[in-house]
């Protein structure tokens, strides 16, 4: 049984359950919204990849906000196939606007969370940096990223079951024409980075620290 969130964000459909965490002893250098994988596959803000990603961002000096999308945990509403979830992402950004108005915002999403987070983050001027973990290029259309002009990190396992690495390399090459994009490939890692979570965390912390330097 996972603990309940320590924060509830009020939204049109009721509330979003969330966990807000400040960096430990490090000075606050920004904020990050961290988004979980597909709810119908059991994805929640307590997912191991999401937890490690948030920890990596905390280590880099960012306040992290993990939310449960609508219909997950104590969040109200029902799953909306990635449409209503876009508004959930915007609600997280609104929270940062109200509570951390002067801080730079990063969106970090895993799998389904990457899909909806990248779509909002590409066009929302409040977001400066993007991180996409386990980008499910075999499942969704990511052509909207061709309009991206922001620094973006893709972290992918070369054994990912939901995102062909060759297809992702092609996408990243196209994104690089307009944005500073990087692809970090973790050898022998599957979609959930089993046995490679420490490496995933290190990649995210290092890239984020460089963006904020």
What are these regions (language model features)?
Residues 1-30:
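N-terminal cap/lid segment of alpha/beta-hydrolase-fold proteins
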Residues 173-192:
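Catalytic histidine neighborhood in serine/cysteine hydrolases
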Residues 109-117:
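Gly/Ala-rich beta-loop-alpha elbow adjacent to hydrolase catalytic centers
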Residues 79-100:
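Alpha/beta-hydrolase active-site loop
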Residues 148-149, 154-156, 160:
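Short beta-strand/loop motif that positions the catalytic acidic residue
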Residues 77, 189-201:
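Catalytic histidine-centered segment of alpha/beta-hydrolase-like enzymes
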Residues 158-163, 191-192:
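Acidic catalytic loop of the alpha/beta-hydrolase fold
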Residues 24-66:
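Short, surface-exposed "cap/lid" segments of acyl-processing enzymes
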